[in-house]
Amino acid sequence: KLIFQFMGLKMEFLASKEFGYPGEQVPSELILTNPSKIPVSAISLKIYDKHYAGGDAAANEPIRVPIPLKLQVDQKLSQPYWLQKPVENALFQVGSQEKIGIPYELPKVGGFLSFTLGGEVFSLKVPLEYKFNDPVTGEIKEPFTVVPEVDLSLSKEVLFLVQGADATVSVTVNFRNTLLEGSLDFEGLTRDQYTIAGIEELPGQKQRIYKVIFLREDKETQKVVHARFTTVSGRVFDQTTQTISYPHIPSLTYFTPATLTLIQADWKVSGEKVGYLVGAGDEVPEVLSALGYDLRILGKDDFRLDFLNQFKAIVVGIRGFNTNEDLALHQSVLMDYVRAGGNLIVQYATSTPLVTKTLGPYPFLIGRNRVTVEGSPVQFDASHSLFSYPNVINQKDFEGWVQERGLYFATQIDARYQSPLMLQDPGEQSNKGGLITAKYGDGTYVYTGLSFFRQLPAGVPGAIKLFINLIEQ
């Protein structure tokens, strides 16, 4: 490799496309340029036990060798090494210690370039890449990526089988080649637990879209089911394909099981209108919509009391009081909404910078306290309406939380607030600032540092149930 670089040899092994599936024909080309006066001879490329001769390279004359590459039928996908085994306890499982620290998976497709120099034969491993010209950036190279011939995408990751919620999921089967005949089913469910209500094929697109309706059961359950497409020949495809792409680093494609979490619960959800004031960004609105609430994202023109009064509750997204200037301009309107009987729920904010220091109807400050152990003990006032209406909260509802309990708890809390929840990390003092609430006029105000923005998208039932209670006050 050093000799190759010292001579200034330039080599490219380029595919005609960025993605290919096992068994696919991918026309490729080997391009080698020798800028030195030292002759390089007997150039060849070996890939999949086949040799492709390129001859000799004269000075500054590029050699171009067409490679009629056909990927092996059992070619492994370009899955990053840290995702090749299931995650355990939030840790990636890497079998080979030598790979740890490598930022990208080693290329799955490549060959061995051999050449003769001064009577000596040299060999160099070369990866297959894809090159294109961007009109703005110029020449860009990306790794050639092996993907499934067929993959799936689901319109939802979590589905709530609760009264009033939409129990429909769209499953899109994407074909890299021609559309294959086959059937869709769900591992973990029997055929009488769901109905395929419709199948659509869009003209000119290599997709087949299944509309699936899941049926409610008589008991509360939570299960993860696996969507899979089986061809008439018995081939099974059950993965999603996702690509991370930024201009300053190579693209990274990875594959995950096409799973859907089904949560069957007898939760009491009114399905009324809920307003959402966006903060730094979270996925709580999508979860509330999936639960059956009539959700509306509020903008700067919506801060009118006559308009806000239609909402059962208004929720402020995470760090809303750090990022949303409209909250500073219209905080008084929100307080009027609460006084008139509204329900305002403020998710965590950091202590600085705040767009306004007035977060609630009575004084409190944002501290830096947090509880990082997601399974840490919890104490709460079971008689308080937040934990008893309309759904009864018990200790089991605090099991299965992810990553943490909460952060940026309230401190220096005015006596007019109630603190019905006590949290603490092991070996630490208990903290009452994770959830505070107060009556103000005819309405209710809540500030919470609980990590609902993590728990709700993850489908943690107890956290979802508690958030429903916050809305339904």
Give residue ranges: language-model regions.
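A glycine-rich, often tryptophan-bearing local segment used as a flexible ligand/cofactor-contacting loop or short
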Residues: R319-E399, G462
